[in-house]
Amino acid sequence: MNPLTLSLVLTTMMAGTLIVMTSSHWFMIWVGFEMNMLAIIPLLTKEHNPRSTEAATKYFLTQATASMLLMMAAITNLLYTGHWSIMKLINPTASIMMTMALTMKLGLSPFHFWVPEVTQGIPLMSGLILLTWQKLAPLSGLYMIMPLINTDILLIMSLMSIAIGGWGGLNQTQLRKIMAYSSIAHMGWMMAVLAYNPTMTLLNLYIYIPMTITTFMLLMINSTTTTTSLSQTWNKLPLITTLILITMLSLGGLPPLTGFLPKWAIIQEMTKNSSIIMPTLMTLLALLNLYFYTRITYTTSLTMFPTANNMKIKWQFKNPKQMMSLPLMIMISTLVPPLAPMMPILT
C-alpha cells in the first residue's frame, strides 16, 4: 500500500475512534463509527485476493447494519425526549436498539458470526487491528451509556459470548479463527463486569490488548497461520514458538500468567456484589478456552516426533524495528500478576 494512503487511512481510523470516545452527541458518535469503518476497509483488502474481498464485504455489511440500528435508536430517542445527548437515553426501545447496535459492532454473541469469518480472511496485521483497536470505539460507547441500559440483557449476552468463544475454538486449526473466538470470550468477560465495576472492564482491556498484540506479532515473525505450521516451526525458531505457546496459555487464563489476573479480579468483584451463579458459570465456560490453548501447546511441543534440523538456524528477526517493543509486550503478557498488590482496584 502507498505510504501516503496508509498514513491517511490510519489517521482517519484513529480520528474516528477518538471522536466516538470524546463525543456526547449521538450524531457525532455515528460519524466517528462511520469514519472508523470506512478507514479500515482498505487495510482489510490490502492483499488482493477473493478471500480478503469477501471478508471486507462481510465486515462492511455488518458494521453498516449496526450503524443504521444506532442511528434508528438515536432518532427514536430524539422523538421521545427531544435531545441528542448520550446521557438522555430514556426510551426503553431506543436503549435496547442501542445495546444491539454497539454489541454488534463489538462482536458479542448473538451478533458474533462475522468476527471469525472476517479475521480468517484478512492478513495478520489487519487481524491485529480488528481485534484490538476496533474494539475501543464500541466499548467506550457501552461504557458511557452503561447506567442507562438493561444490565440483564448485557449479562445474558456476555455469558453467551464466553460460551461461544470457548466452544467455537475447540475444533479449529486456523490460528486466526482461534484468536477471533478468544476475542469474543474476552469481550464477554468485559461486558459481564461492566454492570458491576466499569473500571474493572478497563483493567481487562488494558491486559487483553498487549496479550493479543504479542501473540499476533510472534505469529507474524513465524509467518504462521495454522496449528500444523506452528508445530513445524519448532526446530527453526524454538524460542519464538515457545513464546507463542506461553502467550496463548496466558490468553486462556492459566495461572500464574497475566491472563489469569483479570479473570480472578472479575470473579472477585462479582462475588463481592452477591453474584454467585454468574461467576461460577463464567469460570466453568472459561475452561473451554484454556482447554483448546492447552491442547495446542501439548500437540505442538510435547507430542512432536523428534527430527534432525540440518538447516542453519537464523536468529535474526525479519524486521528489527518492528520487534523493538516485543520484549516489553512479552513481559506484560506473562509477568504482571506479581504486581497485583500494587493495583488499588484489586485491593
Curated annotation (Swiss-Prot):
Its EC number is 7.1.1.2. It is an enzyme of class 7 (translocase). One of its GO terms (cellular component) is mitochondrial inner membrane. It catalyses: a ubiquinone + NADH + 5 H(+)(in) = a ubiquinol + NAD(+) + 4 H(+)(out). GO terms for biological process: mitochondrial electron transport, NADH to ubiquinone; mitochondrial respiratory chain complex I assembly. The keyword Translocase applies. Its main location: mitochondrion. The chain crosses the membrane at residues 1-21, 25-45, 67-87, 111-131, 144-164, 178-198, 201-221, 237-257, 274-294, 326-346. GO terms for molecular function: NADH dehydrogenase (ubiquinone) activity. It is found in: Mitochondrion inner membrane. It is a multi-pass membrane protein. Signal peptide: none annotated. Coiled coil: none annotated. Pfam families: NADH_dehy_S2_C (PF06444), Proton_antipo_M (PF00361). Keywords: Electron transport, Membrane, Mitochondrion, Mitochondrion inner membrane, NAD, Respiratory chain, Translocase, Transmembrane, Transmembrane helix, Transport, Ubiquinone. Core subunit of respiratory chain NADH dehydrogenase (Complex I) which is composed of 45 different subunits. Interacts with TMEM242. Core subunit of the mitochondrial membrane respiratory chain NADH dehydrogenase (Complex I) which catalyzes electron transfer from NADH through the respiratory chain, using ubiquinone as an electron acceptor. Essential for the catalytic activity and assembly of complex I. Belongs to the complex I subunit 2 family. This is NADH-ubiquinone oxidoreductase chain 2. It comes from Myotis simus (Velvety myotis).
